[in-house]
């Protein structure tokens, strides 16, 4: 039986291409997150997430978590996801990344974090509201302990030029 207080840090390297990307491209297609839940078909809580990049390229995007391994298109191609494909992916949650605001530069790379989402409270008052991003519930399909993720580029910083293997997702889960 899985300890109800068990935690795990999962590292995943998504498949990306070594070409320049454009706005609304698929940064990476469905990527397996192994051991995302403690037992087959169960649920866990995603409590932290970051992307470590070996590149100093900045990018904005949307990171989706899904129950199934549904393709959403080829990496570095324009997003063109049908309603049926999106529904078949069984999306569990989404994180948005503002790469120029949510990054930390180290040596020759960057760390992009998803810890808090800051948004203006109103068009004229100038207040900023911090919206909590976690937890996100991750529900595995029957017969597996994996869930899946994909990322789409969207925003203002959307033309990164990276190398294969430049990105690593670091995900914290509680079972």
Each language-model region and where it sits:
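Surface-exposed, low-hydrophobicity beta-strand/loop segments enriched in small/polar/acidic residues
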Residues: 1-175
């Amino acid at each position: 039986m899985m300890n109800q207080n068990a935690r795990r840090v999962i590292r995943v390297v998504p498949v990306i291409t070594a070409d320049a990307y454009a706005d609304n491209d698929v940064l990476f297609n469905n990527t397996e997150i192994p051991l995302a839940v403690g037992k087959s078909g169960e649920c866990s809580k995603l409590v932290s997430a970051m992307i470590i990049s070996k590149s100093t390229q900045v990018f904005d995007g949307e990171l989706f978590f899904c129950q199934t391994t549904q393709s959403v298109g080829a990496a570095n191609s324009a997003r063109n996801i049908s309603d049926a494909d999106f529904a078949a992916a069984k999306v569990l949650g989404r994180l948005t990344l503002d790469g120029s605001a949510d990054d930390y530069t180290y040596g020759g790379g960057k760390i992009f974090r998803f810890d808090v989402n800051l948004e203006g409270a109103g068009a004229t008052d100038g207040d900023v509201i911090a919206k909590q991003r976690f937890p996100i519930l991750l529900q595995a399909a029957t017969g597996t302990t994996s869930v899946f993720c994909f990322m789409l580029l969207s925003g203002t910083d959307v033309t990164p030029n990276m190398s294969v293997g430049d990105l690593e997702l670091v995900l914290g889960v509680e079972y």
